[in-house]
Structure formats: structure tokens, C-alpha cells
Amino acid sequence: MILILRARWWEESEKNEDLEADDIRQVPGTPVRFSYEDLRVATHDFSETLGKGGSGSVFKGVLLDGTHVAVKKLDRLGQDMSSFLAEVEAIGSINHFNLVRLIGFCAEKSSGLLVFEYMNKGSLDKWIFKNDQGSCLDWQTRNKVVLGIAKGLVYLHEDCQKKIIHFDIKPLNILLDANFNAKICDFGLSELVDRDTSQVQTRTRGTCGYVAPECCKIPPGRITVKVDVYSFGIVLLEIVCARRNFDHTQPESENHLLRMVQKKAEQDRLIDIVENLDDQYMQSDREEIIRMIKIAAWCLQDDPERRPLMSAVVKVLEGVMEVESNLVYKFHHALITPAVNHHTSPQPQASVLSYPR
């Protein structure tokens, strides 16, 4: 009797999951539903791995129409199928040039797969740091990347039906297409917020070195979109300076990028933060570099209220607005030395929509 009841429960569970997935498929503008076999064939039996993260592996694939895709195969979904489908519907409905597009999904037999557009230049971290191939990016391209990231965040924070706080903005989560257009990916830690709600109460999440000060309080304070603004400021500094925000291979006086900004600001020598300036950028770029560093400092203010909205950042980047002049360069968060392995995000995730971590 127990076995029969369990079998019936399993059948009902499977039916309910399929019905939920069918509901998504019927909503115009939402991701396409693929069968497991469709994606197994598209990925040649999941043979070419693009990346692996805490929630699954990402494989390269080609759909029947010739479209190149990245397919994320989730390791553990279990009883989270309902929340998985709800998030597919929510995140799949967002559409912006500077966000990696979720093309489709598969929900069969308690397994979940996500199908994303394929970005053939890979992640930003491969292109911007010295001693990597990234040293070839010129100033114009770096400018283009910065503006693209900023526009993507404006859409998430201000233009979506529900505001989306990403929580994990970093070079690894910025992908580049063939023309070096930046697209934000990995919504694995993101949180959807009603438009009439300005703050959320949440646990600490994100990647060490990119996490805003208010997220590190015990217990964490009330969180707003300004946590993404802070992370953007760190990424902007890394793009401009062509170095990581914390580099344990450097002397102690130079291993923390925020401390260097603080020190050089006190000396009125912000330009000195960029090493080998003449080798990396044109001499004429100096004023623009200083302006970019000031934008980053604006985004990195300890007090979230003093940080700009990303729409203001875009206006400054586009030259239609001036950067805030009354900036505080004492970054108390800079006194905290990040862990050596600052690429590691905490394991708990609010979402499974991530490609690739």
C-alpha cells in the first residue's frame, strides 16, 4: 500500500511539474521549453564544458536552427521545481541588450536545464587584467564595456516591472559578445523586489572584494539597489586600473586598490593609481581616466545614500551630467583585507538562474 501511494504521489508530482512548465510556455514572451533530448542532442551529449559552478555545469550547444547557446545543467533541483519555474518566468521576461538572454529551459523528471545566448569572447576578467590577454583592450573599448554594464544595471534597478538586485556584479559575471558589448549574467544570487519597496532584509551574499559595507554588518542591514552600485564601482576601478581590487602578489602598501585610491586622493594624485599609463592608454586619455576614477569613488561611498543611482552614472558617462564633487575618499571598508581567494561566492543562493559562475 505504501509503495502504491508513493508511486501515485510521484505521478501526481510529475504531472503538476509538467503543468506548471506548460503554463510558462503559454505566456507570450517567456522562454522556450525544450525537451531533455533536444538539449542532449544540441550539446552532443553535454560534451563541451564552458564552466562549472556551485549549482551546475555549463555546456556549449547548437540548436537545430544553428543558434549557438550555453546550456546550464543544474545539479540539484529536487523539490524546488515550482520556484525554479517561477524564476524562469520572472527572469526570462526581462529583455535588454546588456543582459545575457535566457532563451529557454527544460523541466523534466525533477531536472532543470537553462539555455542562454552564447557569448564567444567569454567573461570580462579574461580581458582587463595585466598579464592576461586583456591587456590588449584599448581605452575606447573599456569605456564601451563600462557604459554597457551601467545600462544593464539601470534596466534591472529602474526599468523592470520588479526591481532586480543582482548582488554579484564582478568581472566574472560580465560576458562579452563578438563586438565587446558587455552583458550581465548570473542571476544566481539576485532578488526580485516590488517597485514600491525600496529596501529588503537579506543575508550576506556576493563575492568578497565586491560586497558593499552594509552587507557585511552583523546582522546585515536593510539592502537597496545601492549594493550593486558599490560593486559596479569596484569593477570600474578594476577596468580602469587593469588590476584586481586585491592582489596578494603586490607589496602590502599596494595590494588593496581601495586603499591606493584613498592614499592618492589625499595626495591629489589619482592618476598615479594607473601603472604604466603611457603603455596602456594614450596621453590624451588622462583627464577621462581621472573622471572615471571619480565616478568609481562616487559609487563607493560608505554611506549608501551618498551613492548615485545607476541612471545618474549613465548620464555622467554619456557627458550630460557632472560627477558629484563633494566626495569622501575615506573608505572604511578598505581597512578590511579580503580573503586571498576573492572569487569565491558563498554557497547559499536565492536563485538557480546563473551562467556561468
Model segments located where?
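Membrane-proximal cytoplasmic juxtamembrane segment of single-pass receptors
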Residues: M1-V115, N120-K151, R195-Q201, T207-C208, ...
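Intrinsically disordered, low-complexity cytosolic regulatory tails
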Residues: V69, S111, P251-E252, I271-R357
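Protein kinase catalytic-loop region centered on the HRD/HxD motif
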Residues: K151-I164
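Pre-DFG segment of protein kinase catalytic domains
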Residues: I164, K183-D186
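Activation segment
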Residues: L189-E191
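Conserved catalytic-loop aspartate of Hanks-type protein kinases
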Residues: D228
